[in-house]
């Protein structure tokens, strides 16, 4: 109950944004480690640049990104579900901290990398060791990071 209240402000923003961009109801996703509501962004809204965004316990994602059984889709879903855990820990502090971390990450790493890479790679809230998943801008699980068995256990915990 306390966790639900702690994440409520951001989750309400996520549900409101999800209803606006999806035009319909969400579906439940996740597993034992984290659960969320998934809203699929309607095409034609000019949001094609958005991969997936997690706001509290609501995930907004472009069509097809988190569907399917391929490894990248499953790891991306698990990555977004890991953000719900970060919301559990940080509550209403998550959004301002994430925005500050994104801005600092971009400022510290200007030059040499695409913008999307800059704002994700150096942001501690996007780091693999915190999100325990794949970067949205790189191949999932670089060589040696995790064995196949570890990947399967991780995906099972997140219901992906």
Language model features by range: what are they?
Residues 46-52, 59-77, 120:
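Short pre-active-site segment immediately N-terminal to the catalytic Zn-binding motif
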Residues 81-99:
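Catalytic Zn2+-binding segment of zinc metalloproteases
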Residues 11, 76, 84:
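Ser/Thr-centric signal marking residues that sit
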Residues 1-26, 37-43, 47-48, 54, ...:
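Metalloprotease/metallohydrolase-associated module, dominated by Zn2+-dependent proteases
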Residues 32-34:
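Extended acidic/polar regulatory tracts at the flanks of large eukaryotic scaffold/adaptor proteins
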